[in-house]
Amino acid sequence: MFASRSSRRRGAVLGAVVAVTALALSACSTDSSSNVPGGNDAAEVSDVQAMLAGAPVADDALFTPGSTMEKIRDRGTLLVGEALDAPLLSQQDPTNPDDVSGFDAYLAQLLSVYIFGEPRVEIVPPASETREALLQNGTVDVVFNTYTITEERAEQISFAGPYFSSGLAVAVKADNDDITGIDDLGGKTVIVGANTPAVLAVPEEQPTAELVDFATDPQAVQALLQGRGDAYVQDYTLLASNAAANSDLKVVGQPFTAEPYGIGLGLGDTEFKDFINNWLLEIQ
């Protein structure tokens, strides 16, 4: 039976993550001059600090000899595959590189608190196509990166969770009124992220669409704004974050797939998976 050292109430921790991220979304939506969706507002900083201070910490008995958890704790830092350029999800403050804010970023910090009793995270930014390799070669311990659980990926790595559900959606330039969703992408040039579910999902919905893939989300957004594609298909959460940060973009229609987010970890590491799933239950 899993347990945690602290007896404080935990159920509101994940809710606090959502609330802090929503605060950032509100600030981002009302101030287009801001490059960073979180971390600069004093109230938000205070909320993040309170959230981390109230987070659960794992019992010593869970760190069994030879386990991944023990190795991480002995090392003294959690190595996380995590973006630095995803608004509202995981974005680095350009004026303070140590400040990374957003939903995935806060969850990674909470997991490190569960392991160490305080946030100790070292971020390794992945591209979409390198996430599995980073886990397979031990460069990172976990991946928090809007990481959709798929059968193909689950053959290469393991997933804890899911901890959130989203879906693929369509983004276009703000002045584009011709495309209103996936049904309008037949015969269009569609931008997708390399090694993302959109690579397979778009042809299934629109076989005549021409795909152009990019390694990172910022590259894909830039390509759309430069007119190198008619639309960008990506996870709705990421697209909505981009649109909130950039008034030249908009999301059209509704998500047309269901995409559960998981936490990536090494293939077959059942003990570590159970450890993380227990932590997810504690913060819900």
Where are these regions (language model features)?
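C-terminal motif of bacterial Sec signal peptides marking the signal peptidase cleavage site
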Residues: 22-27
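Short helix-initiation/N-cap motifs at beta->coil->alpha
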Residues: 121-133, 177-178, 212-222, 226, ...
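Short loop->beta-strand "edge-of-pocket" segments that line small-molecule binding or catalytic clefts
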Residues: 78-82, 98-101, 182-195
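Extracytoplasmic small-molecule ligand-binding "clamshell" domains
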Residues: 38-47, 51-143
